[in-house]
Amino acid sequence: MDSQGRKVVVCDNGTGFVKCGYAGSNFPEHIFPALVGRPIIRSTTKVGNIEIKDLMVGDEASELRSMLEVNYPMENGIVRNWDDMKHLWDYTFGPEKLNIDTRNCKILLTEPPMNPTKNREKIVEVMFETYQFSGVYVAIQAVLTLYAQGLLTGVVVDSGDGVTHICPVYEDFSLPHLTRRLDIAGRDITRYLIKLLLLRGYAFNHSADFETVRMIKEKLCYVGYNIEQEQKLALETTVLVESYTLPDGRIIKVGGERFEAPEALFQPHLINVEGVGVAELLFNTIQAADIDTRSEFYKHIVLSGGSTMYPGLPSRLERELKQLYLERVLKGDVEKLSKFKIRIEDPPRRKHMVFLGGAVLADIMKDKDNFWMTRQEYQEKGVRVLEKLGVTVR
């Protein structure tokens, strides 16, 4: 609460999950899938203890997804369907989750770097006009990650469900000219895993079984340190084969797919995406920075988001960065490599890092009026109120 007794809400709207709670807390109150579903056919009114409604959101929609036509309002960090997004926010602020009177609350929202200004304008408009929050702030996700890690300078590799971005932050300022975005993230890896399992002969439906395959991915996938060696193991032995029991009782065996699916992060061509993978993108980003700041960046690489949770990802990233540095900067001089200092921070709670940073920031700033865009300012200026955050509104 701020000094006037208003609740300060923090809402990290991800492409795949909404993480919401209050300023100052060290864990989200609620984490639920960012999906909206509508029944394909209305035959039953109840499944178990869940009543089937014309519109199902979040946890309930996820449980009954096989009977629903499911939509994700966000794709690659950008809101694609505003009506569904509002349903998601109604659910977040309503009795099912936070149960707040939005008129007496302030809210801190998050967004990926390089998001279109139009997206941010619309968010602010909805927050003030539909929900009438007393104060709103929109923060860049990468900066919040560093706050949660107690840093002001570093490079954040944030990979969630919809988008991966590499965002250098120097002395508390994100550097948009150096920020790189890769539209490969958790959802694409799940899709690729479905494709690989179909090739193995298992029958999966792209939409109905999506969540099931996502769970297989989270339980069994990892990033290979040495890809040739992993492929050899997959072909010649059964060391990598693991069994997984599906919700309907079927048992499937997953082998080489365990490392092949996340490999798309490092080799985008596997899923027909042009461009370099996450390791080379990170290297290019740091090398494009001012020469005086590079060593600071190499020493403070922070992983964030659910798609950085694969076992083996930090060590593979480090290996590829060293290799690229050796080839392109040291021109193959192995002797000098010992002077190259690199540190990848992989905090155990990195899945919720953005929320944690938001909760810290909102708590520090809860009584600072010049930090928040207020409802009164919005009534006077409209979306131009965003200029307070340093956004140019044309």
From Swiss-Prot:
Domain of life: Eukaryota
Modified residues (N-acetylmethionine): M1
Any one biological process term the GO annotation gives: positive regulation of double-strand break repair via homologous recombination
Main location: cytoplasm
CDD domains attached to this UniProt entry: ASKHA_NBD_Arp2 (cd10220)
One Gene Ontology term of the molecular function aspect: actin binding
Protein name listed in UniProt: Actin-related protein 2
Gene: ACTR2
